[in-house]
C-alpha cells in the first residue's frame, strides 16, 4: 500500500509540474507578442539569484481616465486591461472586471488603490537572468528598456525577452 501511495503522490506532482510548464508554453506559442515599456527596479535576491524586477507603464493606471465597468476597485481584485498597439507599444485602453469578448487584453491583480489610481500586477514583474547580469541591466536604467511578452487569448502573459534600445539582450555570452 505504501508503494502505491508513494507512486500516486509522485505522479500527482509530476502532472502538476508538467501542467505548469505546458500552461506557460501554451501562452508562449499561441500568445500575441506585445512590447511593454518598463524600467528595472531591483536586480538581486540573495536567496533566488539575479533577477530584474520590472515596473511597467501599464502597472499604474488612473481608472477615471480609462473606460471601465466598475466605479470602485479593491486590493486583490482580478482585472482585465484592454490594450492597443500604439507606436509599437501596448498601451491601456480600458480596465474591466470581466474578460473582454474580443481584442487584446492582459489579466492582472489590483495590488493597491490610491485615490483614482490602481497599481496592478500581471505576473510578469520579475525576470530571472544569469548570475552577474542583473546589475548590468540595472546600470542600463537610463536607456530605453522594453519587454517582449506573449499574451494568450485568456489574458495570461509570459515574458519572452528583454530589449535595450530595441535590441534583444543575449545572455549566452
Regions found by a protein language model. Give the residues of each.
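Extracytoplasmic/periplasmic terminal helices and flexible tails
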Residues: 81-86, 92-96, 106-173
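Short, compositionally biased
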Residues: 65-88
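Cell-surface/extracellular proteins and modules involved
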Residues: 28, 51, 60, 168-173
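Long, non-globular segments of proteins
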Residues: 3-4, 21, 31, 41-42, ...
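Hydrophobic membrane-insertion alpha-helices, especially the h-region
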Residues: 4-23
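Short extracytoplasmic
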Residues: 38-68
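Extracytoplasmic
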Residues: 31-33, 76-78, 142-146
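Aromatic-capped interface at the extracytoplasmic side
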Residues: 17-38
Amino acid at each position: 500500500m505504501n508503494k502505491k501511495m508513494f507512486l500516486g503522490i509522485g505522479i500527482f506532482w509530476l502532472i502538476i509540474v508538467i501542467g505548469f510548464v505546458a500552461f506557460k508554453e501554451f501562452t508562449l506559442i499561441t500568445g500575441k507578442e506585445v512590447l511593454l515599456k518598463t524600467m528595472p527596479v531591483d536586480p538581486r535576491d540573495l536567496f533566488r539569484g539575479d533577477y530584474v524586477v520590472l515596473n511597467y507603464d501599464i502597472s499604474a493606471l488612473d481608472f477615471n481616465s480609462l473606460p471601465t465597468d466598475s466605479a470602485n476597485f479593491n486590493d486583490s481584485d482580478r482585472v482585465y486591461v484592454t490594450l492597443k498597439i500604439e507606436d509599437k507599444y501596448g498601451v491601456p485602453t480600458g480596465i474591466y472586471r470581466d474578460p473582454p469578448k474580443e481584442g487584446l487584453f492582459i489579466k492582472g491583480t489590483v495590488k493597491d488603490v490610491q485615490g483614482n489610481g490602481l497599481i496592478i500586477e500581471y505576473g510578469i514583474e520579475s525576470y530571472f537572468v544569469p548570475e552577474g547580469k542583473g546589475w548590468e541591466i540595472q546600470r542600463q536604467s537610463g536607456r530605453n528598456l522594453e519587454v517582449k511578452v506573449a499574451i494568450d487569448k485568456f489574458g495570461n502573459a509570459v515574458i519572452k525577452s528583454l530589449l535595450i534600445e530595441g535590441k534583444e539582450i543575449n545572455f549566452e555570452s
